[in-house]
């Protein structure tokens, strides 16, 4: 989880760490709960603004790629 926290800090993303869970606060658009599993991070959408969903949907794939590559480097 340290690499994920480092990534969040480097990208000016607010986060809340609680045990094995990290909640990423991505502006007013996304709030993502990240749970570290054995071989990957699992994400759960907590909040999603549908009005911007079409324009920013690729961000989900980007976040997922970053999280999983971060875990592989750990």
What are these regions (language model features)?
Residues 1-25, 46-64, 71:
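Negatively charged, low-complexity tracts enriched in Asp/Glu with abundant Ser/Thr
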């Amino acid at each position: 989880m340290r690499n994920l926290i480092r990534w969040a800090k480097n990208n000016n993303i607010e986060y809340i760490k609680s045990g094995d869970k990290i909640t990423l606060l991505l502006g007013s658009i996304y709030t993502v709960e990240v749970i570290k599993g054995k071989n990957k991070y699992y994400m759960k959408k907590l909040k999603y603004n549908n009005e911007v969903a079409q324009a920013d949907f690729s961000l989900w794939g980007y976040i997922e790629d970053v999280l999983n590559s971060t875990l592989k480097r750990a």
